[in-house]
Amino acid sequence: MDVAAAALPAFVALWLLYPWPLLGSALGQFSAGGCTFDDGPGACDYHQDLYDDFEWVHVSAQEPHYLPPEMPQGSYMVVDSSNHDPGEKARLQLPTMKENDTHCIDFSYLLYSQKGLNPGTLNILVRVNKGPLANPIWNVTGFTGRDWLRAELAVSTFWPNEYQVIFEAEVSGGRSGYIAIDDIQVLSYPCDKSPHFLRLGDVEVNAGQNATFQCIATGRDAVHNKLWLQRRNGEDIPVAQTKNINHRRFAASFRLQEVTKTDQDLYRCVTQSERGSGVSNFAQLIVREPPRPIAPPQLLGVGPTYLLIQLNANSIIGDGPIILKEVEYRMTSGSWTETHAVNAPTYKLWHLDPDTEYEIRVLLTRPGEGGTGLPGPPLITRTKCAEPMRTPKTLKIAEIQARRIAVDWESLGYNITRCHTFNVTICYHYFRGHNESRADCLDMDPKAPQHVVNHLPPYTNVSLKMILTNPEGRKESEETIIQTDEDVPGPVPVKSLQGTSFENKIFLNWKEPLEPNGIITQYEVSYSSIRSFDPAVPVAGPPQTVSNLWNSTHHVFMHLHPGTTYQFFIRASTVKGFGPATAINVTTNISAPSLPDYEGVDASLNETATTITVLLRPAQAKGAPISAYQIVVEQLHPHRTKREAGAMECYQVPVTYQNALSGGAPYYFAAELPPGNLPEPAPFTVGDNRTYKGFWNPPLAPRKGYNIYFQAMSSVEKETKTQCVRIATKAAATEEPEVIPDPAKQTDRVVKIAGISAGILVFILLLLVVIVIVKKSKLAKKRKDAMGNTRQEMTHMVNAMDRSYADQSTLHAEDPLSLTFMDQHNFSPRLPNDPLVPTAVLDENHSATAESSRLLDVPRYLCEGTESPYQTGQLHPAIRVADLLQHINLMKTSDSYGFKEEYESFFEGQSASWDVAKKDQNRAKNRYGNIIAYDHSRVILQPVEDDPSSDYINANYIDIWLYRDGYQRPSHYIATQGPVHETVYDFWRMVWQEQSACIVMVTNLVEVGRVKCYKYWPDDTEVYGDFKVTCVEMEPLAEYVVRTFTLERRGYNEIREVKQFHFTGWPDHGVPYHATGLLSFIRRVKLSNPPSAGPIVVHCSAGAGRTGCYIVIDIMLDMAEREGVVDIYNCVKALRSRRINMVQTEEQYIFIHDAILEACLCGETAIPVCEFKAAYFDMIRIDSQTNSSHLKDEFQTLNSVTPRLQAEDCSIACLPRNHDKNRFMDMLPPDRCLPFLITIDGESSNYINAALMDSYRQPAAFIVTQYPLPNTVKDFWRLVYDYGCTSIVMLNEVDLSQGCPQYWPEEGMLRYGPIQVECMSCSMDCDVINRIFRICNLTRPQEGYLMVQQFQYLGWASHREVPGSKRSFLKLILQVEKWQEECEEGEGRTIIHCLNGGGRSGMFCAIGIVVEMVKRQNVVDVFHAVKTLRNSKPNMVEAPEQYRFCYDVALEYLESS
């Protein structure tokens, strides 16, 4: 046996090399498919399986073999188990067969081992239609003995299906013995020992139901036969039940429980016994999916008790046909469900409850058990409200007060309101005095226990009724009349108070209060003196009170002091008490002074021929101090009645001697003496030829008689009282000649005094001129030394803005040397024969004095007449920079009335001829027919051959001569329209002809859906006529784009560079909210325009409004810097003489002023990178005198120019429904910067406390927000998704005590409202934790995922204003920048949040802007970066330490680069 086993491999090798094809002649002796193996398996078309583990071996009777002698003799196929590992298999494949009738396959087999061990297993497999191998249909294992055994295969697979029988030998663990087969026969009749199955039919069933296969077999069902249902993939299902049909036929049932689509496959029946096996054909299990609608029902109509729907059952998921349609509906708040069968496309649901939400679904049914599919998507809708059932019951009065009434009513349930949304309104009306009525309706809270009507008038009949209203109707209660209680009365009307003054009494009357609020019972008047013209009157006494009856509305107050102001308080009273008092001040009249009694007293002390000396005694003031004493001389006439001494009618009109002489007056004033000159009796000489207070006291005429009067006068405000007395009489002399005083001598004396004074004044003026010249030379030297210190001057400017400059006089409109703006600002026409040429020409002195001066250092020579080239017209003088803030504030009062008046004074419309522009051949070249080029200033193009009209383009020269460094620049600007399609070639001709290097574009191509400018430049290269324009570089920034072109012309060996500066930050309507971006834009253009270049081409759409704004601002910035003044009004006026309607709106005119003011206040704050380190150290140096630094002053300037938000700016954040979404109500985002949420989340609003911010290069690149509150976490993730944010920067800590929860999943996946957030990874790098999230919107899954990285910064302690490390914070910024460049092609936004969305977040944004600024422009401008952020949100970079930290990080970045 061992020898034979050892020799078997050699035998196998010889067998494999045997020439089997030569034995093909023996095939004819076998039936198809059978084989006796006399000539080997190949002769029977049997094949070894190429993919098994080893081969069957052929044993031939004609060839020697080495099998043990006890093995059968003859030819057969054998497997030696001892040569193979357990589990290895050998397969022998019979040829494929197609039989059309019942047949049988029988064969011989043995399993033998010398020691009686298990040699392995013989399996029979049947493959159908070249499908997969299933489990064996028959097998035998273990030792069977030395003799051959027979077995049968009853295969019930019929044509056209084909099958293949496979014999498989499997080695067992014993590895000993042989497995052999022989004499395989295919018989044309049924098997004798194994039953044959009838054809197995397909089974169709609905998903979720049980499927049953019934296999019917012909033959005897032996007790030991094994039956099962075999699936094509090898799964075996046991038999459920067998049943004998008759003595030769039985049935077997197989059941599959609750089948699904995954159970749909091919199945066959198998029976097995020791004698053989039977196998049926494969039948298909077909699983049908019950139908379900794709779409929900569609609502066609709705009423209070019905819903009309369309089923929408044509598009389904699942299988048809549909044999039944049903509608299933229920209240969304209830649990019961009703189902109605429907046989029409539409269905009306009746008997529903009003204002109730229903969920409606459609059910579809196909044939078969379980054919009803799942309900389709729901239609959730609500019925309309129904009219209220009845009128509310009568109101019950719960409380009556003077100004409020409390009412209540029955509880209003749904059975009354018939609607969940209803209003309870109390309407009331009442009549006031003068037949005035008042009516109003108040919405009440139906759930409140009591309802109060406030703000009612006291002591008034009020009619009330309640109205119950819902969207479908209203019911009103009966009207109830109630009288409110009395209250204290209102004040006595101020206008009704009238006081009539006398010297010692006041008559006061008044009217009843407009709001008596009941029955007036009395009036009370309190009064006291508060001041007096007479110092002797006491004014600090206690107030006195007078009470009047209710019907007495006047009173006379006696025994008062003259010239004294009394304050009266009048108040009325009802039974409820006194109301508020009304005050009035009344002043008693003053009394005339009291003069001493001269009756019987001779006041004459001495008398000469031309004089008389009298004794003057002081008067006694009564109610007002003495203002003056007057001496009146009256000439005696013999026929005039003599005045009596003592009290008399005084002389009120002062008349000088000269006027009396020429006018024939009978008296004249000889002197007026101040009261201080007469503290006690003193002599006075009448006729002493002296002048007193302008009154000449001439010598008296000896031959005339005179009465001498002494007057005392008291005068306060507009009241004057005079008392006079005759104190002496001088009789006429009888002998001396008459001497008449000569007024001419008095005049000569005055002239002499004036001449001496003038000489002294001239000397002083000459001295002042010398001082001014010396001062001026010193000032010029100081200005030259201070050229590099712009920041210090800016700070001084802010600190000194509101001071009055006593040493610098303003420009006066009366100056006879004032000239027009065209004259004084050197606007020069282009053509010498221009009718608008000014005649004034500046001389060398103008040029010499026009040296560059600092922007904020206003030069003294502005006060020196014609020396300044910036004096202006008489009506609108230039404004000093130092006075600009005050001027603008004044002009903005009363709704900017000053600006409105100035702007409306400009000439509107055409002011010069434009015949060329109006020609028919030029009409298509004008964008607007009313804004075209004037003839006298138009740009004349060099004509194209054979086209005389080709010299026209809608453009005008704007001429200005700037004396800067001795260079004159006529035609500094060209103002033109935005090109239309027909003028693109002309536009480039103009740029080439005028040698322009800069194009300024102040419009977008399309605004509000209208084309504003044709795209006249290429993205790459384009040819326009004979011009080739190539775009070589484009630099997009947040508010403007800089494009660099090369310009070539056919026939010219020259390539020019032209830069286009396209300002994109001008809004579609109005003007920019702030001028910061435009000012930066203008500075960039100035720096880029070469000194030798031609005019700057400026255009918007029409070339008037925005173009004019740009040019005026540019001119005025130069003017302010050179001369310290601005003249906006006359500049606009001059520009309008060159092109129609430059600066088109009042809003633009105001914006120009605001822009100039911002430029003057802020100054130039950019520092070149190469100078930054030295400049920064200079900025932080503390000045020993001021104890401050330039950096601190700059931050104070920043605070002063930061706009303050008003309540109306944040109207959306202030809405009541948004209050709980704000962490701090004093840190709200303005409406104009809000990112409104797009994704809907139930009833949540679209508001979030966040603001869009510009970065250096990209508008709205940053979103700054507060740390999410517990109730805004969902909103935060909506914000991230809706605005494509790829970075989240977290600058504060998680702190539940401050309402700062963890808003992200640490691992795995969480859902926040409609947004699903999945944490993909988490890592830590120094002070930064990096988390990557994958988020998607579950309401819009088709949009895919958004990858977001969160940067949680750990290096900033909560109690510190700045981070602990500059380097780590800079690293954070650079990490975020790198991630942003990698994600979404750099287009993703960055969300930055701290506790309040202010200081910390602003600092991150500001440093990010500065880093980009350094990369792009090689400058550092922290002031501009923070100012730009604060224009949107004022709390960006809150503390001075944070502002300095921005500078520190900028320095760190420069030193590390």
From Swiss-Prot:
Residue ranges of the Tyrosine-protein phosphatase domain?
899-1159, 1191-1453
Q: Which family does it belong to?
A: Belongs to the protein-tyrosine phosphatase family. Receptor class 2B subfamily.
The record lists the catalysed reaction(s) as:
O-phospho-L-tyrosyl-[protein] + H2O = L-tyrosyl-[protein] + phosphate
Q: Where are the transmembrane segments?
A: 753-774
Can you say where in the cell this protein is located?
A: Membrane
Identify the keywords attached in UniProt to this record, alphabetized: Disulfide bond, Glycoprotein, Hydrolase, Immunoglobulin domain, Membrane, Phosphoprotein, Protein phosphatase, Receptor, Repeat, Signal, Transmembrane, Transmembrane helix
GO CC terms: axon; dendrite; membrane; neuronal cell body; photoreceptor outer segment
- Using the record's annotations, give every residue carrying the modification Phosphoserine: S868
Name of protein: Receptor-type tyrosine-protein phosphatase kappa
Query: Does the entry annotate any disulfide bonds, and if so which pairs?
Result: C215-C269
Q: How does it sit in the membrane?
A: Single-pass type I membrane protein
Q: Where is the active site?
A: C1100, C1394
Question: Main subcellular localization, coarse class?
Answer: membrane
